Amino acid sequence: MLVDAFKDLPEIVSICKRSPRNGMMVIGGGVPRNTVQSAALASKKGMDYAVIMTMDRPEIGGLSGSTLEETVSWGKVKSAANKIMVIGDAMIVFPIIVASVLERLGEDFKRAPYLKPKGIGGI
């Protein structure tokens, strides 16, 4: 597997530009978090919502623990965005969040039409 954030960035920026609202859910941090946040900045829109789950703490200087207030100051997340930073183990926290979201969405949940993959029935 080859991971190349520079090749992914134009596609992510394009998705951000076409989407009526943008958000991110980041588990951990590092390059994936920075790539998504940079796409929001490049699209000149900023994120409308953000969830960051990390074990890193801003007090000790861990980059993955940089606060959402910092991302707002860069324009990567809108100041009025719904945002939360969860300090905890993703192996515990993530399944609980997913179960809660799926329960709230119910049977009416549908993928945004502009994000549906082509050729597989929109699943």
Task: State each model region's role.
Residues 21, 31-32, 38-123:
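C-terminal functional extensions of proteins
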Residues 1-27:
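Active-site rim loops that border cofactor/substrate pockets in soluble metabolic enzymes
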